[in-house]
Amino acid sequence: MLVPPANFGIAEEGIYRCSKVETLNLSFLETLNLKTAIFIGGQEPSKFFKDFFTRSSIKWIVLRMSDFSAAAVPVKSSSVSNANLYSNNNSTLSLQEEKKKSTANGSQNSTTGDPVIQEELAYHLTDNDDLMLIKSTCLKRTFKTLLNVDNYNVLLVDKTALVIGILRKIQKWNIASIINEYRLFSGKNRNYFAETFLEIINIEIEQEKDNKTIVDNKAKKLPLENNRTHSIEYKANSGKLIRVNEDDLCREPEVPQRLLTLINQIETKVKNNKVLQVSGVLGDDLKKTSSDLGIFGHRYRLAFNKKENGDYGYYKARGKDNVKIRIPCDSELPDWFRFQRDLWEKENVPEEHHFYREHIFT
């Protein structure tokens, strides 16, 4: 009988999630073709599961409770209500103080809706903060494994149900959808501080550079450098044997027949267009097109490729003191992540290119 683990679900293609695993779920886990298992929130695999992982050649990673804040532990409903009252009282007091300061400053701080002022008043998380439920070191290690397609399929055993919420934050989900998914999988163990943490945290991504493209570029440069060295050596060795004849220098250079035919075709097209313009058959908009100008009518892009540099607006976050995580290079990322990133870039980030155009034969 196949029994899935508690709060089991498919987060993305190749990523499975649950809150805990038991021996009853072993037959179900065998059908998932797992390569990696990540245990988050203090739970460690039992000896029975360790034997199963070694027998199935599954790598497992355990993140200790020292990487988490004490506020990540599930609290009772009474403590949640007390926390709500305490936070509401603090928020009302802080709002009253801000109103007093704004009225005292007068017209200088009249623009309270300024995004710069809102950014200064925003709360910024650090590892020393109690609201930082998962430390940055834990997040870096988790997402470096979670977003590497070489580790798929991955089972994420997350007792806190926060890692997938942070993944949704990276995917630019709405905060309401993130909280709803968190409440759906956490159930009665949901935490007020966890919801606040998901709302406050900002993630900034740094992507590793693809070593394959660097190696390919070096491999392309090496034969060119070798050819240059060989040509230099050949010139140095054969420089004494070259004999120059003055009659050869006085001759005109020979032009290949193919270039002559191309020039004749371009000249005939230009003459025909002039005749059509005089007769009024050809409009003003079609006087000079890119096909008439040949290769010199095209524009050439000078912008660098984003895939090589990993410079995406999708990876950037607003505000200061962002939690920086490092993800694998583009070739090791899953297809669903690259698809969502490229789609978001296409819809939200306008492309900026610097073009130049050749004006020869125009």
Swiss-Prot record:
Q: Null mutant: what phenotype?
A: Exhibits an absence of G1 checkpoint in response to linoleic acid hydroperoxide (LoaOOH) treatment. Rescues the temperature sensitivity of CDC13-1 mutant.
Q: Give one GO molecular function term.
A: phosphatase activity
What's a GO cellular component annotated to this UniProt protein? cytoplasm
Q: Spell out the note in the miscellaneous section.
A: Present with 5370 molecules/cell in log phase SD medium.
Q: What does this protein do?
A: Required for replication of Brome mosaic virus (BMV).
Return the protein name.
Protein OCA4
